[in-house]
Design a protein with these regions (language model features):
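A conserved regulatory-domain signal marking ACT and ACT-like small-molecule sensing domains
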Residues: 75, 91-93, 120-229
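A structural-propensity feature for long, helix-poor, extended segments
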Residues: 43-86, 380-415, 430, 437-464, ...
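Conserved phosphate/anionic-ligand binding catalytic regions in large, soluble enzymes, centered on
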Residues: 10-30, 341-359, 403-408
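Functionally critical mobile loop/hinge segments
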Residues: 79-86, 90-93, 418-522
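Acidic-glycine-rich active-site phosphate/pyrophosphate-binding loop
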Residues: 1-5, 36-40, 321-338, 372-393, ...
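C-terminal regulatory domains involved in ligand/effector binding and gene-expression control
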Residues: 126, 222-225, 229-313, 519
Length: 522
């Protein structure tokens, strides 16, 4: 398994969408590394789902923020247009419409430096904040950032590649991959190097001095699934292998994922500190929103979470019970914060970010769990989310809402089982039951915004997680193993029509009552 826990419980970001906001920002932030600075003008052309829903998702603001170098958790993202004006950067947002040959979340970024020729970069947002750079100046590339990466623009001349590889080798860098792309013989070419070691800061200046090199840059792709070193022993790519490792070590899923992350980053203390930050922000995104609700960008959300919490005394006993009522209110609160462009933890996406914290925090309060137990439950959730991310999808544009809320609910169900002392097998059963119960759930954001029905579906995701966890803990086994359920999720996602995959062109998004207040299709 190549994913860090914090690629699943993350990014920490300004809402409302991990793919359309955080992912878009990251594409633009990488693109700016591939062109000389300063930039005088940038033109963004959006395709497919990006084109149709960019206003409601804050994609336009995120792209400009990325070009300015802001990070996903910078609250100035919402003010990026004004920041660009202050910086003297001219930009345009163009809706490119549909192109079946492109990924559902594609943007083409044309950058015009103050000096030098323009550079055009095409990128894709893969879900959960992960991205891929797919083309530079019309030449196909594949930059995901899985290893330390160097991008070099040069002329297609004899001896250039030898000089480049010699420069990297002289610094002790082992080249893992080297791919050269050219538009024509003797013309513009690009070489992308991936190395096993980190890129020294001064190496780029040296590379820029090589004959026929026109530009060079180290490329850091935030959110990339970093490939593991050879001494990482706790790697797993299936639920079956995860269960085997837990059995071999006599530990829970959460404990194994924590140990795997410690191996990955080489520092157990650092891994724990990062999870402490995630847990603290989850508390904050719930508590602050319940105490101080604020309206969402689209106006659908404004204090519904607090209303649910206040209704508990009257409604909890005959209906959901106290713990589930709290969990639903907490989940709804996270969506309200995200929809007002507040800072949240995508878990695994922004559109489904309420399910895991809602379930884990509410259940933790009910049993008086300490922070160690809560963190272990989150480690567990991260393991389940990583497996689904790698073997199916967490992108609504690829797999519908089953990929987002369905994944989050499966993560939460497994986490609840571990929090309540269940076995590894029961955790995987709970996740499998949950996937089955939400299979085929469509993504149909009204007016292209991550508000309605997204908030309500987070509430339903919490309820699905609670019921699935209780079934598993009662030893109700699932006839379909976890890995097969994930495979089914992937297959179903591919069969969903495009209108039901985050395009706002089907389902509830096209109901007359929703469309009346839109003022124009997004």
């Amino acid at each position: 398994m190549g994913m860090s826990a914090f690629e699943v419980l993350g990014p920490i970001m300004v809402g409302p969408s991990s793919s359309h906001t955080a992912g878009a920002l990251r594409i633009a932030r990488v693109a700016r590394l591939l062109a000389p600075r300063p930039l005088a003008r940038v033109d963004f052309t959006l395709f497919n789902s990006f084109s149709r829903t960019h206003r409601g998702h804050g994609t336009d603001k995120a792209l400009v923020a990325g070009i300015l170098g802001l990070d996903t958790d910078d609250e100035r993202v919402r003010d990026s247009f004004a920041l660009a004006e202050e910086a003297g950067l001219v930009f345009s947002i163009v809706e490119g419409g549909d192109d079946a040959s492109l990924h559902p979340n594609t943007v083409r970024i044309s950058m015009h430096p103050a000096e030098g020729r323009p550079v055009e970069v095409e990128g894709e947002s893969l879900g959960g904040g992960r991205i891929r750079i797919s083309s530079i100046d019309g030449v196909g590339v594949n930059i995901k950032g899985e290893l330390p990466t160097v991008f070099v623009a040069h002329r297609d001349k004899p001896g250039v590649l030898a000089s480049l590889t010699g420069a990297l080798g002289a610094r002790g860098l082992n080249i893992a991959t080297m791919r050269t792309f050219r538009a024509e013989r003797g013309g513009a070419a690009y070489t992308v190097f991936e190395a096993d070691e980190q890129i020294p800061d001064d190496l780029i200046d040296e590379v820029r001095g090589i004959a026929h090199v026109t530009f060079a840059s180290a490329v850091n792709v935030a959110g990339a699934s970093q490939q593991e070193a050879g001494d990482v022993t706790l790697s797993f790519s299936s639920g079956a292998r995860l269960a085997e490792l837990c059995d071999e070590r006599g530990c829970s899923i959460g404990s194994l994922m924590r140990a795997s992350e410690a191996e990955r980053c080489g520092d157990e203390t650092l891994a724990d500190a990062r999870m402490d930050r995630v847990l603290a922000l989850m508390h904050e995104e719930v508590c602050e929103t319940l105490s101080f609700p604020r309206p969402s960008l689209g106006g659908f959300l404004n204090g519904q979470a607090a209303t649910v919490a206040r209704s508990a005394a009257l409604l909890a006993h005959p209906l959901m019970g106290g713990t589930l009522t709290s969990a639903v209110a907490y989940a709804m609160a996270v969506l309200e914060r995200s929809a007002s462009m507040g800072v949240i933890v995508a878990a695994p996406t922004a559109g489904s970010a309420g399910v895991v914290p809602g379930a884990v925090l509410a259940c933790g309060e009910a049993i008086d769990a300490d922070s160690t137990a809560l963190s272990r439950a989150l480690w567990n959730a991260a393991a389940i989310g990583a497996l689904i991310s790698e073997n199916a999808s967490v992108s609504g544009a690829e797999g519908g809402c089953q990929a987002e809320v369905g994944t989050a609910a499966a993560m939460a169900a497994s986490a609840l089982v571990e929090l309540l002392g269940g076995s590894v097998a029961q955790c995987l059963d709970a996740a499998s039951i949950c996937i089955g119960n939400l299979l085929g759930l469509v993504c149909d954001p009204a007016r292209g915004m991550v508000e309605y029905p997204c908030q309500n579906r987070n509430a339903i995701g919490v309820a699905a997680a609670f019921s699935s966890a209780q079934l598993a803990l009662a030893d109700i086994t699932c006839p379909v193993p976890f890995d097969e359920a994930v495979d089914a999720m992937a297959r179903v996602g591919k069969t969903l029509p495009e209108s039901l995959r985050e395009t706002a062109q089907g389902g509830l998004a096209v109901c007359p009552s929703v469309c009346e207040g839109c003022g124009g299709c997004v």
